[in-house]
Amino acid sequence: MFKATARYIRVQPRKARLAAGLMRNLSVQEAEEQLGFSQLKAGRCLKKVLNSAVANAELHENIKRENLSVTEVRVDAGPVYKRSKSKSRGGRSPILKRTSHLTVIVGEKER
């Protein structure tokens, strides 16, 4: 099992979970293809994290890329940046800029 994380990514967790669903329980090649065709911003971020996890596997255990599959994908909510927008009659409305923590774990395919 090899893990890679990206923290404090400026992507809403709800939207990132949609992209994470595309790559669950797939081989690394299939997951990369799925994320490559995805037009979501989170897809680009998850592809980078996936490549990092694969690089960890290749570097530390000398496992070939073809023998790896996505074991777990986790998207957790990070801190929320709070901004405000002025409204009529002296009021304001909050604008919440959400962040995500992305975790991808890859492991060897079960034979």
UniProtKB/Swiss-Prot annotation:
InterPro entries in the cross-refs: Ribosomal_uL22, Ribosomal_uL22_bac/chlpt-type, Ribosomal_uL22_bac/org-type, Ribosomal_uL22_sf
Protein keywords: Ribonucleoprotein, Ribosomal protein, RNA-binding, rRNA-binding
Any single GO BP term: translation
One GO CC annotation: cytosolic large ribosomal subunit
GO molecular function terms noted in the UniProt entry: rRNA binding; structural constituent of ribosome
Family: Belongs to the universal ribosomal protein uL22 family.
NCBIfam families the record matches: rplV_bact
Function: This protein binds specifically to 23S rRNA; its binding is stimulated by other ribosomal proteins, e.g. L4, L17, and L20. It is important during the early stages of 50S assembly. It makes multiple contacts with different domains of the 23S rRNA in the assembled 50S subunit and ribosome.
Subunit structure of this chain's protein: Part of the 50S ribosomal subunit.
Identification of the protein by name: Large ribosomal subunit protein uL22
Organism placement in taxonomy: Bacteria, Pseudomonadati, Chlamydiota, Chlamydiia, Chlamydiales
